């Protein structure tokens, strides 16, 4: 227990993040299955819309703050950044431990918020006046706000740690332009966290005082404006979605270049600039989430254009990945299957994003299932596919064990069918006008909702199969004899698994 509770070792802390993220992911998945069960047939299943919206809200918060971010930034980030930099550990190892241990209390607060009063049925955006005292009396929303505060502090500390580590602890020979793309993606992610989370903290703190201390930041009766909250929230919320996908970009770059048998990713400097551009542009497009609140036409025109510009650096990344794959004799290993699935499905999600960027079109599609389909393509098939690819790719390094390849391929096929069956029909529902965040719908929408629910059941079976595959690997203890990877990235020069202290002597990189 002492080793895990007080650990200052980036590998142990990374492992804790993985376990925590997997556990939270199971909770979040259970909530999503409840959502799909409710929508699997017309009529009610679990009760009124309040409980339904509590489930939807908790599903979003858990998947974002307690599954994707801990696994990508906490798990892969902690494990790989020091190894790829040739650094003995993170810059602030004890703060690293604290970043992790802020998360279980944060998750507990969120779960408790669902259990007191009527729960926080606000949606993950927590818009007032629905989230204000007038519509959500009781402590639920307050507890959810405190949960976000803790998760936010955790992420800010982690971000400071990663930025400091990369600035100060690069090994001799690793200049910024030669730094691995995954490390770049984590640094840019950390910068985004550092700049956006304080704004969220301000917004939810003002909401807290509106609810409890009689201020009126968001209450028109006292001269406030609920639209101010939306601006503040989305100034955080839009960078947040890039925070969720950028580490995935970094992992996919590594996996594609290694599986292609290439020395490096095509256009790696361009890839770095593309990620920097995405990070910068992510901060100046937030109001595209607010096309329906009545902004001036010139404001809408700006946010439409700026949003579409993000497609350019994203396109650079997609085509560079395709160029990296070009001309290779691929063996379809499980990791490359996930990476190829990522490139294809993330592109589909990106295309629906360009559709939604048009303010005039978005007036019709806003708050319909078209939006749900869009962001689940980039999250459930972008972020999650990247996590799967990365986990399978680096599992032999992390554990020194092998997974069952045949099963992993079957698992990929099951998941691929499941997620597409779940989310592709939601585009049709959205175009037909089915609104989000309702527990019931007119009968005309039944067919595609049934298809979607069947898809979610298939995905659930896939996830359970994945946990079985990991269990089987840990029980069988098939040791890795040597890493099959080309050593295009220095983490593969480690033992499998790496020693507790990887670089007691600092490496010198010459190339």
Swiss-Prot record:
Residues engaged in binding heme a3: 374
Places the protein is found: Mitochondrion inner membrane
Binding site for Cu cation: 238, 288-289
Covalent link (1'-histidyl-3'-tyrosine (His-Tyr)) residue numbers: 238-242
GO BP: electron transport coupled proton transport; mitochondrial electron transport, cytochrome c to oxygen
Reaction catalysis annotation: 4 Fe(II)-[cytochrome c] + O2 + 8 H(+)(in) = 4 Fe(III)-[cytochrome c] + 2 H2O + 4 H(+)(out)
The organism of origin for this protein: Drosophila mauritiana (Fruit fly)
Pfam families (UniProt xref): COX1 (PF00115)
Protein name per Swiss-Prot or TrEMBL: Cytochrome c oxidase subunit 1
Binding site for Ca(2+): 38, 43
E.C. number(s) listed in UniProt: 7.1.1.9
Gene responsible for this protein: mt:CoI
UniProt similarity note: Belongs to the heme-copper respiratory oxidase family.
Binding site for Fe(II)-heme a: 59, 376
């Amino acid at each position: 227990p002492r080793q895990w509770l007080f650990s200052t070792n980036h590998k142990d802390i990374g492992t804790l993040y993985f376990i925590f993220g997997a556990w939270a992911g199971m909770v979040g998945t259970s909530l999503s299955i409840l959502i799909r069960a409710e929508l699997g047939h017309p009529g009610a299943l679990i009760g009124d819309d309040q409980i339904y919206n509590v489930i939807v809200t908790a599903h979003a918060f858990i998947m974002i703050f307690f599954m994707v971010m801990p696994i990508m930034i906490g798990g892969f980030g902690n494990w790989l950044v020091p190894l790829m930099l040739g650094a003995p550990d993170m810059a602030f190892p004890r703060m690293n431990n604290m970043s992790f241990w802020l998360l279980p209390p944060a998750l507990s607060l969120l779960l408790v918020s669902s259990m007191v009063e009527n729960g926080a049925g606000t949606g993950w955006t927590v818009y007032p006046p629905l989230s204000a005292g007038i519509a959500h009396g009781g402590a639920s929303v307050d507890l959810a706000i405190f949960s976000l505060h803790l998760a936010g502090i955790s992420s800010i500390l982690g971000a400071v740690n990663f930025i400091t580590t990369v600035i100060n602890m690069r090994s001799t020979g690793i200049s910024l332009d030669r730094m691995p793309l995954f490390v770049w993606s984590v640094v840019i992610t950390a910068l985004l966290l550092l700049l956006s989370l304080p704004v969220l903290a301000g917004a939810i703190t003002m909401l807290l005082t509106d609810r409890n201390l009689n201020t009126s930041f968001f209450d028109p009766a006292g001269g406030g404006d609920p639209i101010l909250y939306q601006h503040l929230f989305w100034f955080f919320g839009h960078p947040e979605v890039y925070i969720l996908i950028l580490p995935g970009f970094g992992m996919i770059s590594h996996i594609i270049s290694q599986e292609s048998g290439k020395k490096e990713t095509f256009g790696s400097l361009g890839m770095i600039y593309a990620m920097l551009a995405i990070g910068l542009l992510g901060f100046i497009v937030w109001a595209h989430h607010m096309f329906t609140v009545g902004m001036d036409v010139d404001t809408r025109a700006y946010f439409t254009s700026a949003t579409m510009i993000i497609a350019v650096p994203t396109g650079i990344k997609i085509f560079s990945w395709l160029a990296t794959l070009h001309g290779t004799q691929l063996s379809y290993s499980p990791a490359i299957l996930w990476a190829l699935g990522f490139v294809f499905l993330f592109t589909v999600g990106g295309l629906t994003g360009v559709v939604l960027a048009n303010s005039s079109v978005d007036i019709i599609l806003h708050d319909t299932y078209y939006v749900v389909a869009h962001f689940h393509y980039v999250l459930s098939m972008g972020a999650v596919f990247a996590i799967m690819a990365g986990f399978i790719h680096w599992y032999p390094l992390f554990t020194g064990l092998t997974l069952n390849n045949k099963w992993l391929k079957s698992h990929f096929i099951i998941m691929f069918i499941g997620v597409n069956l779940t989310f592709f029909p939601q585009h049709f529902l959205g175009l037909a006008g089915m609104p989000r965040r309702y527990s019931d719908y007119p009968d005309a929408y039944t067919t595609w909702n049934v298809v979607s629910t069947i898809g979610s059941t298939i995905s659930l079976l896939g996830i359970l199969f994945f946990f079985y595959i990991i269990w089987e690997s840990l029980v069988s203890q098939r040791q890795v004899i040597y890493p099959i990877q080309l050593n295009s990235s220095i983490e593969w020069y480690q033992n499998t698994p790496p020693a507790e202290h990887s670089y007691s002597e600092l490496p010198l990189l010459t190339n």
